[in-house]
Amino acid sequence: MLSLVFSAMTGLVGAATLAATLSLLVLLTAAASARRRPAPISAPTLLLAVVVPAHNEEAVLVSTLKSLNAQSYPAECVEIVVVADNCTDSTAAIARRLGATVLERTHASERGKGYALNHAVSHLLIQPVVADGFVIIDADTVAAPDFLQQISARISQNTDPRGYGAWQGRYGVLNAHDGWRAALMTTAFDLVNHVKPLGRDTLGLSAGLKGNGMAFTRALAEVLPWPGGSLTEDLDYGLELARRFDLRVQYVPEARVQAQMPATAEQAASQRSRWERGRYRLVRERALPLLGEGLRRRSFLLLDAAWDLLMPPLAEIATLLLLFLGLTLLGTATYLLPHPVFWLSAAGSGLLGLSVYVFGGLRVAGAGPEAYAALARAPFYALWKFALLFTDWKRTPKSADEATADEWVRTERIPQADAAPTTEIRHL
């Protein structure tokens, strides 16, 4: 009986982690085979509204707006709109000084990025001249000089008969050299924000929205308002695109943005805590209903979205694979597992597959030596992350109302010197 229970437990852990690893390898294979799309030569020039949600961002907003003002795109075709949401600093004044349209918003309870974006897009949709596309850039972000050109070209190539379209640019790290945490985030972003969406896009699936460097057509903005009270408003919006319109998010790796990441333990804990609380709440509330709806509608797009929600993050997959290996070794030593060669082979294959994904993915992403070097810190990061999750477990919001209260509890920023990300994208 004990052997049966132990085998079932080991098999459950192994099946889940091996399925996740196989999924990552499929995406890596697709990403590695993706063809580089040549930059458009004579794409139509569209009117774009660039929305920058900001809450007390005076330390970093100058670099963001300078990068947007320096775009290789006709200035008369771009309106930069900064939403100064519940600000108590000079964010609004800085934005006006640098030529942006400023929408100042104050609300006692509806606070956060989602509400700010909803306010801005609603305002822009009722203007006499409405933009062809809406672009969302975070206030701590530097956009590559050709970012808007690449986004505009993709919008102009949209073939959806309804005019609906959503795109995600390549979202990377601006301060990769500010300590090992930022360096490791660079490595993670190469895998999560480039390899996975590139693979999904190549397979005809939704690349997903990452919250920064996103773009939407006017037609889509008119029928689907941006969600307000959510810590994961970008993920929620992407899921609604699939549910309501059978629409996938397309990936534009040539359109690059880079944002500041935490460099200290305190900053990292604040950001990671918010991200993980939002993600787990989203999984709890939406994954199984989405899976059921996908089965009822026979929609592979919805089934893939549900699977993506259920699949653990990379650190958790690695930890579970090590747990699988540990259970296998224990079961082999105590004779609780039959056919030990099978179990050991499965555990070894999982770890090998994950290693192939990580190192192969970094090669596809064109990562530099610092990205590989940062992997040496990954075990310490995983331990820190699980300790943080355990600490936060009892504080996880049980409802959207609870989550809303800390949406603008943002990470402290480090003032950045003027910078711009490289536009070069290296491929295999």
Q: Can you say where each PLM-predicted feature lies in the sequence?
A:
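Short beta-strand-to-loop acidic/aromatic patch adjacent to the donor-nucleotide binding site
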Residues: 128-142
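Membrane-embedded multi-pass helical conduit in multi-pass membrane proteins
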Residues: 29-33, 40-42, 308-395
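A conserved acidic beta->alpha catalytic loop
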Residues: 84-92, 107-109, 142
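Short, acidic, metal-binding catalytic loop of nucleotide-sugar glycosyltransferases
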Residues: 66-77
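Long helical/loop segments within the catalytic core of UDP-sugar-dependent glycosyltransferases
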Residues: 106, 110-127, 145-230, 273, ...
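N-terminal membrane-anchoring/stem segments of glycan-assembly enzymes
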Residues: 1-44, 358-364, 385, 422
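Acidic helix N-cap motif at the loop->helix transition within catalytic regions
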Residues: 62, 89-96, 104, 146
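Cell-envelope/extracellular polymer assembly enzymes that use nucleotide-activated donors
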Residues: 46-49, 79, 236
